[in-house]
Amino acid sequence: MATKKAGGSTRNGRDSEAKRLGVKRFGGESVLAGSIIVRQRGTKFHAGSNVGMGKDHTLFATADGKVKFEVKGEKNRKYVSIVAE
């Protein structure tokens, strides 16, 4: 006979992989066209001048230059722009 009662099963023990979101190029950094600037879910940051947005809301540079973060507009939205050097 077993001297230990059988342990029950658990419904926990799973977690999703981290998605590596966040700012990839910070303000003042030089970037080349096509460089990813921000990986995000939704529009935490909006695309400014010389910045494009992918279908998953990733912001990327469309021209060479320096990254500039700014808050503007009535709703105080955060914009990311590329300023030509």
UniProtKB/Swiss-Prot annotation:
GO cellular component: cytosolic large ribosomal subunit
One record GO biological process: translation
InterPro entries in the record: Ribosomal_bL27 (IPR001684), Ribosomal_bL27_CS (IPR018261)
Annotated region (Disordered), positions in chain: 1-20
Ribosomal protein is among the record's keywords: yes
Keywords carried by this UniProt record: Ribonucleoprotein, Ribosomal protein
One Gene Ontology term of the molecular function aspect: structural constituent of ribosome
Alphabetical list of PANTHER family matching this protein: LARGE RIBOSOMAL SUBUNIT PROTEIN BL27M, RIBOSOMAL PROTEIN L27
Matching NCBIfam families: L27 (TIGR00062)
Family per record: Belongs to the bacterial ribosomal protein bL27 family.
Annotated protein name in UniProt: Large ribosomal subunit protein bL27
Gene it is expressed from: rpmA
